[in-house]
Regions:
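Local sequence-structure signature of Cys/Sec-based thiol-disulfide redox active-site neighborhoods
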Residues: 22-36
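Propeptide (latency) domains of metzincin metalloproteases
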Residues: 122-127, 133-160, 166, 170-178, ...
């Protein structure tokens, strides 16, 4: 990690106020600390789906979701869920078929998901316990729906365990870290929302203190650099959350740290997934591993195509250029394929990494009807029409 400039540096060590502390002693600080020397990287990262994968809700953001959308979700048992503003908060209320009084009214305290592709689901605090609410917002249709995985009836509370937050936050402090069994109780003011610098680069306190005292040293010290990691270590960093649920964890959530090997933390890892398994919570890394492009190079990893510091979804020019950097001089015979007759040959991803129906994530967009979410496969290949 290099430094473009350090315009706001401190010339002596200044105590950093930690947001939380990992059981291994690592202190988490705010990303404003990184702004001192990495302003451009931080500002671009703030716009990424990774950083926005969890956040405390604001009234303004929730009001935007209420605008021009049907804020009622009807369930098959006759229960209705209403999402409405109440004072300076937005709440979800559940009503029995003939009742005028809500069965419950719960505040929407935390948003999970960036809302860029699929949408957002919402969590509610009950003292120190965290639960998922039953109504979620589906962004493509600007529609409120029954949350994924819920039956079409008023469901019991769904607790949010650390394994959920492990992939939707940088860190969440358990109320009782020494407990042998993980539960859904947390220290509310010790959650580091979103995926920030520390999740991928490890502890930063020593790094920050060194460079505040040595602002002219342009070589990053006391920080993990991805260039120092092997390809397998780099892949494992992404596979922690992008190799899905076909694994069994044998250590507590948040135990995995950058540079660790995932097989020391997970068992039953499916490294050769079939192309049919394509889900944002499933097998991007395994699908990539099963691709000829990956198998025929010793250097390809997730960051060959993805810059984690930038929001680049839909940037066809960039992704096609990456494909072309290896596949120079490739020609197609459009007369042999009807799909090619309809394309300008400028969208490699659309044909060779097509959207596919997810077998794991389905949404109830209509009463008692499930529709699969489409996810772009990461098994690069030649597909039929």
């Amino acid at each position: 990690m290099g430094f473009a400039s350090c315009q706001n540096f401190q010339t002596s060590e200044v105590a950093l106020t930690p947001l939380a502390q990992h059981p291994n002693g690592m202190l988490y600080v705010g990303m404003e600390t990184c702004l001192e020397c990495h302003a451009d990287l931080v500002q671009s990262h703030l716009l990424t789906p990774h950083y926005n994968t969890s956040k405390q809700t604001t009234l303004g953001a929730l009001e935007n979701l209420l605008a021009n959308s049907n804020t009622t979700v009807k369930l098959n048992d006759g229960t209705s869920l209403f999402i409405e503003k109440e004072g300076q908060q937005v709440v979800q209320k559940a009503f029995a078929p003939t009742s005028q009084e809500p069965l419950y009214a719960k505040t929407m305290d935390i948003a999970i998901g960036s809302g860029k592709k699929i949408g957002q689901t919402f969590l509610n605090w009950e003292e120190s316990s965290l639960f998922q609410l039953q109504a979620s917002h589906f962004n493509p249709l600007n529609q409120w729906i029954n949350s994924p995985g819920y039956g079409s009836f008023l469901a019991p509370k769904r607790p949010i365990f650390p394994r959920c937050l492990e992939c939707h936050s940088t860190y969440a402090q358990a109320e009782n870290p020494s407990s042998p069994m993980e539960n859904n109780r947390y220290v509310q003011n010790q959650i580091v929302y979103g995926i920030d610098c520390q999740r991928c680069h490890g502890p930063v306190v020593e790094h920050v203190n060194y460079h505040r005292k040595n602002p002219m040293d342009s070589i990053g010290k006391n920080i993990l650099k991805y260039s120092q990691l092997s390809r397998e270590q780099r892949l494992d960093m992404c596979a922690l959350c992008h190799q899905g649920t076909l694994e069994q964890s044998n250590q507590k959530s948040f135990a995995f740290q950058p540079g660790d090997r995932l097989n020391n933390f997970r068992t039953q890892i499916n490294t050769q997934a079939s192309k049919q398994v394509a889900d944002v919570h499933a097998n991007q890394v395994a699908l990539l591993r099963s691709s000829a492009c990956f198998q025929q190079t010793k250097t390809m990893d997730c960051m060959t195509c993805h810059n984690p510091h930038r929001a680049e979804a839909g940037n066809r020019v960039k992704f096609n250029a990456i494909c072309a950097s290896c596949h120079q001089g490739v020609t197609h015979a459009p007369a042999e394929n009807a799909t090619l007759l309809k394309t300008s040959f400028s969208d490699c991803v659309q044909c060779h990494m097509p959207l596919q129906d997810s077998s794991m994530m389905k949404l109830e967009l209509e009463l008692d009807s499930l529709f699969p979410v489409q996810v772009r496969t990461h098994k690069i290949g030649i597909y039929g029409e």
